[in-house]
Amino acid sequence: MTVDAVRVELGARAYEVRIGPGLIARAGAEIAPLLRRPKVAILTDETVAGLHLDPFRQALVEAGIASSALALPAGEATKGWPQFARAVEWLLEEKVERRDVVVALGGGVIGDLAGFAAAVLRRGVRFVQVPTTLLAQVDSSVGGKTGINTAQGKNLVGAFHQPSLVLADIGVLETLPPRDFRAGYGEVVKYGLLGDADFYEWLEGAGPRLAADAEARQRAVRRSVEMKAEIVARDETEEGDRALLNLGHTFCHALEKATGYSDRLLHGEGVAIGCALAFELSQRLGLCAQEAPSRLRAHLRAMGMKVDLRDIPGDLPSAEALLALMAQDKKVVDGKLRFILARGIGQAFVADDVPGDVVRALLEDALAER
């Protein structure tokens, strides 16, 4: 299999997302052209470090590149002020300069945190994303959104800071626990739902074999990245089209906050549930036929994924409380909730005028089924 390259066209800040097998084994050769001096600082997590840090550093050694590494605790709870401050202080202790490169080796949590640390360190240093989860490869590593969570909600503090390079080694996805792989698939299916009905139809057939079929996996990652790159090139800072990428996320972020950013609900699981709710909301508003949410739920079930609120273990707050959590979402405009709705599969659009009582009724019905 060959390596695919998808270019994110952002003028002087354009970069490539390279997708294929064996990219960690030759990471040194891939990163070397970016370096002013042969040294990088790696931010990772303890789980990823145990699997991939040594091979990654060996690849750097083979290219004559020295490295230092900090492994943070794994999990969404790391994506907050304490570990962010720890990472920034460590980078300063390592004397990382403005012309140096920080490497984010890990999933979405590490990519977001490391990217934000790079954005604020000395008012901005370059960084390279080496995403090791399906979710990070198809979504969070591309497009320059970085940040952390706060007590008030998810991703409320951050910056747009584009990477200089993304290396998506599809081989490392074979080390993912099945639950994490399925969670990442929530972001893959999102792309078909928001703007490519043919891709969604292909996923309905190919989805169940992605974990075991490297060629299908690479195709899924490549098409997802192509779609994201096209949208980011049109709307880097989410003034318009880029909001489409938040399909399912208004519900998702409220549910993540309600479950304490814990293992009760992984981000990609929340995205899948959020997409199902967004399509159900669209149907209730008369925007799409009942076939669309039914078809989506059937596919997610076939993939063994969480689909409804009843699939989330433990207690959940009331519909009113979930609405209050949504009101803190960063997509709120003039105090009004912004949803990504759909006229059908592959036909998403941004809606700023969704009646709150319809959303409340949807949540009440979903909670009643638990």
Swiss-Prot record:
Cofactor annotation: Co(2+); Zn(2+); NAD(+)
Residues at which Zn(2+) binds: 187, 249, 267
Keyword Phosphoprotein assigned: no
Any one GO MF annotation of this record: metal ion binding
UniProt cofactor note: Binds 1 divalent metal cation per subunit. Can use either Co(2+) or Zn(2+).
Example GO biological process: aromatic amino acid family biosynthetic process
Listed GO CC annotations: cytoplasm
Catalysed reactions listed for this entry: 7-phospho-2-dehydro-3-deoxy-D-arabino-heptonate = 3-dehydroquinate + phosphate
Major place of residence: cytoplasm
Gene3D superfamilies: 3.40.50.1970, Dehydroquinate synthase-like - alpha domain
Role: Catalyzes the conversion of 3-deoxy-D-arabino-heptulosonate 7-phosphate (DAHP) to dehydroquinate (DHQ).
This protein's name: 3-dehydroquinate synthase
Recorded name of the encoding gene: aroB
